[in-house]
Amino acid sequence: GDVYKRQIVVHGGGPRIKRELDKSNIQSKFIRGLRVTDEKIINIVESVLIDFNNDIVSSLDKKNTEAVSIHTKKDNIIEVVPEAKELGFVGLPNKINNDILLDIIRQNKIPIISPLGLDKNNQTHNINGDTAAMAVAKSVKSRRLLLMTNVDGVLNKEKKLIDEISSSEILEMVKDETITEGMIPKINACLDAVNNGVTAAGIINGTKQHSCLWEIFSDKGSGLSLIHISEPTRPLSI
């Protein structure tokens, strides 16, 4: 079906990175939810994410779905600037090469993108997965940005799923702490996307089978919080 042919996947890799760093007895320090990344860590992060990327592509191949790897060692499309000095090699996407992406999509293949980028000196940087996905969605003006997580979207005070929410309602929920720290980076990625040409952005439970298909084909979605823009909104501060 056509629905598969225009998808772009940006993957993460936190648990695999943690396993590999543990093996080398490297303790990670986090600032604002981002891993402080020195030279030793960035080398491990890059190799783990590239291996994971190749695993995803080969499992899709086995399902007769043609996918193409994109990462810092092959067709890098993300140019970054350093996010903050104290974070080391953590990058903020500055520019996305749409041509490579659109070329892959035109061949009816799915781009599988690692959350890595290169700065102007070709130094590899680690990128927060949600930030990378949002930057790509904005750049190609996607119809939909879906951020997959292991929880059911955004929950209200009664812990019930909110299926549609506007940007102004989000700000209220952050003020009264209904939306907590862990969800804020995802919400920010969604807000940034819908402020910049993406029709709607959602946070979805990726551990539920077929959750993406439900979201694309059904009116009700499946454990999804969909964020529509009500007016331009500044990012939330943590």
Language-model-derived ranges and their functions:
Residues 1-4, 227-238:
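Single conserved hydrophobic/aromatic residue that forms the stacking wall/gate
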Residues 162-165, 214-226:
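Conserved, well-ordered active-site substructure
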Residues 38-65, 114-120, 124-136, 162-212:
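Polyanion-binding loop/helix "lid" in catalytic or ligand-binding cores
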Residues 12-15, 22, 33-35, 72-75, ...:
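Short, ordered loop/turn segments at secondary-structure junctions
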Residues 22-112:
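Ligand-binding beta-strand-loop-alpha-helix segment within the catalytic cores
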Residues 2, 23, 135-143, 192-197:
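Alpha-helix C-terminal capping segments
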Residues 68-71, 77-78, 140-154, 203-204:
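Glycine-rich phosphate/pyrophosphate-binding loops
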Residues 8, 110-114, 146-148:
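Structural motif
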